[in-house]
Amino acid sequence: MMSLQQNALQFNSKFSFDFSGGNLSSDSGLLFIKEFIYKIGFDNLLNQYFGADNRKIHSVSSVIEQLIYQNIAGYHRDDAADHLRYDPVFTAVLEKEALASQPTISRTLNSFEQKDIDKFNDILEHLYKMTHNPLDKRHIILDLDSTNV
């Protein structure tokens, strides 16, 4: 059994982690999120559905991925992108020298059409099918709440 003290991340073997101290970052938990996203192939799904664009620096899929990480880390406003643009954890996780700026994010979001919303729905459906097995009926979970009647 592996312990957390001796591990490397699969999405980028240059990263390893231990809990013996050193430089701290309040956003370093994103490395574990990146590992999860890598293992389920979510980044490949984004590229499959949104990867065919001609933007040179920040593709639609990379802007979406950046927004996902920003929200997971608690940066819910798109103007946080300007403060995080060169953050070492974010640039490492997104594998970029610089993140998309707030205006780039706004332009990307404002360019979405119904076909893009349909792509998001397809991604959600794919993730659901990946994680849900209707034939697995060994466990039934009943969520019961008490009520005052």
Language model segments and positions:
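Dynamic "connector" segments at or just before major functional cores
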Residues: 1-149
